[in-house]
C-alpha cells in the first residue's frame, strides 16, 4: 500500500488544527514550523520568574467546533477565564459580553492538545515547494526533504505564503495583494507594582493601543508585576527597523504619556517585533 503523507507548514492555531483533523482521518502528517515553539501568536515569553503573553492576549469562542475544543481544554486545566477591569482612553469600559480565555500555564497550551501524536519539525523553515509526479517535495534549511507529500497545507502569514505558493499558479499570485500590519510589543516588569487604573487599557489614538497587566491573569506570576503593551500598526510600521532595546525605550515613554505620570524604572524591559501581526 502506498505511503501517503501530508505536510502542513506552520504550527499556529490554523496549521495545527489542520494537522489534527488530518490525523483524525488516519492520515500521516508532518508539520514544519520555522519557530522553535508551537502556537504562533499564541505565545508567552518567560524570563526567569517573569511571564509575558506577548502575542494574542486572549481568545473568544464563537464557533461551535472551537467551543468544543475550549471546553475540552478547560476540563483539562489548560484554559481559564480572564475578567480584567478595563478602561478605554480615560473611561471605564463595560465588561465583555463574551468570556476572554487564556491558556494555562501559557497561551500555547491552547494548541498543544492539537499537536499530540503528530510529527512536528520545529526550527525548520520551508523555502520552496517542488512539484513532482507523485506530489510535492519541500526545500528547507537543512536541504531537500527526502519525502514525497501528497498535498501541502500552507498556514503562514500572507507574505510567506506568497513566496511559497506564488510560483504555482495565477490564483496564488493574488496572495500578494494581502497587506498585513506589524506590531511592536513591549514587555515591562515593575517592582514595586504600578497602578495604571485598570488591568487592561485601550487607547483609540496614539502610539499605544493596548496595555495589559499580565499579572492580573489567572495562573500568571504576581511579582514582579508584568505588563504587555501593543503599539499601533502605524507606529509599528514607522519604527519597524528599530532594535528591540530602542523600541522598548520608546514604548515605555509612550506608556507614561498615556498614563500621564512618570513610572519607576522597570526591573526588566524588552520588545518583540511581530512583522505580520494582523
What are the language-model segments listed below?
Residues 187-242, 246-260:
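Active-site substrate-recognition segment that forms the wall
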Residues 1-14:
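Beta1/beta-strand and adjacent pyrophosphate-binding region of the FAD-binding site
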Residues 58-65, 83, 87, 91-113, ...:
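Short beta-strand to alpha-helix junction loop
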Residues 39, 145-201, 261-264:
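Central helical "cap/lid" subdomain
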Residues 122-137:
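A conserved short coil-to-beta-strand element within the FAD-binding core of flavoproteins
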Residues 21, 43-86:
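N-terminal FAD cofactor-binding segment of flavoenzymes
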Residues 249, 253-278:
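Flavin (FAD/FMN) cofactor-binding core of flavoprotein oxidoreductases
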Residues 9, 20-48:
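Glycine-rich FAD pyrophosphate-binding loop
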Amino acid at each position: 500500500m502506498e505511503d501517503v503523507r501530508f505536510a502542513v507548514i506552520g504550527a499556529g492555531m490554523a496549521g495545527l488544527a489542520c494537522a489534527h483533523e488530518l490525523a483524525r482521518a488516519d492520515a500521516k502528517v508532518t508539520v514544519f514550523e520555522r519557530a522553535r515553539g508551537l502556537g504562533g501568536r499564541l505565545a508567552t515569553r518567560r524570563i526567569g520568574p517573569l511571564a509575558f503573553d506577548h502575542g494574542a492576549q486572549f481568545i473568544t469562542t464563537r464557533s461551535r467546533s472551537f467551543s468544543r475544543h475550549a471546553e475540552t481544554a478547560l476540563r483539562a486545566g489548560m484554559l481559564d477565564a480572564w475578567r480584567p477591569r478595563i478602561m478605554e482612553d480615560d473611561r471605564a469600559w463595560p465588561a465583555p459580553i463574551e468570556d476572554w480565555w487564556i491558556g494555562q500555564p501559557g497561551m500555547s497550551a491552547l494548541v498543544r492538545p492539537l499537536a499530540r501524536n503528530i510529527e512536528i519539525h520545529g526550527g525548520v523553515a520551508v523555502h520552496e515547494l517542488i512539484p513532482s509526479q507523485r506530489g510535492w517535495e519541500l526545500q528547507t534549511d537543512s536541504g531537500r526533504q527526502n519525502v514525497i507529500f501528497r498535498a501541502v497545507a500552507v498556514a503562514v502569514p500572507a507574505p510567506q505564503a506568497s513566496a511559497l505558493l506564488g510560483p504555482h499558479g495565477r490564483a496564488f499570485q493574488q496572495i500578494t495583494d494581502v497587506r498585513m500590519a506589524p506590531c511592536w510589543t513591549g514587555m515591562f516588569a515593575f517592582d514595586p507594582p504600578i497602578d495604571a487604573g485598570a488591568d487592561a487599557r485601550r487607547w483609540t489614538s496614539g502610539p499605544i493601543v493596548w496595555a495589559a497587566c499580565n499579572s492580573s491573569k489567572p495562573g500568571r506570576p504576581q511579582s514582579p508585576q508584568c505588563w504587555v503593551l501593543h503599539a499601533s500598526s502605524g507606529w509599528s510600521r514607522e519604527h519597524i527597523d528599530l532594535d528591540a532595546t530602542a523600541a522598548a525605550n520608546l514604548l515605555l515613554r509612550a506608556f507614561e504619556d498615556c498614563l500621564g505620570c512618570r513610572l519607576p524604572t522597570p526591573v526588566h524591559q524588552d520588545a518583540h517585533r511581530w512583522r505580520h501581526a494582523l
